Amino acid sequence: MHIPNPDQARVERTKILGYLLNQEHPDGQSKARFFKQCGFRRSQWRRLANALRNQARRSEVTTVRESSHGTRYVVEGAIETPTGNRLEVRTVWIVEQNQSEPGPRLVTAYPLSSTDR
C-alpha cells in the first residue's frame, strides 16, 4: 500500500527550512546535522523535498494511524542524497480531516537506524 494520492504529496518549504535543515531548531537540530552530512543544504532545500516526495511515491506504507487530526501514514524506504548515497529514512505523512489542499502533507522525516528495520 502507498500513501493516498502520492503525486500530490506536499512538502512545505517551512518544514524543510524551519525544521529538517534548521540546526537551531530544538527538535530538528539532530536531523539537520544528519541531512547536512548527507549533502543536503538549505540553499537547495528543494533537493531534500523532492527526495522525500520520491520516497513516498516508491515506498510502501508500514503503519497507518487514525487520530482526531486525520490519518497518518508511516513510510520507510531509501532516498538518494546529493553525495550519491542511498539513505534509509522513515517519513510520516498526514491526510488531515477537512483539509483544503489535496494530497498528504509531510509531518517529519528521520534516518532509520539498524534497530528500526
Language-model features: locations:
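Compact soluble domain cores
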Residues: 1-77
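Functional cores of ribonucleases/endoribonucleases
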Residues: 51-105, 112
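Low-complexity, intrinsically disordered terminal/linker segments enriched in charged
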Residues: 113-117
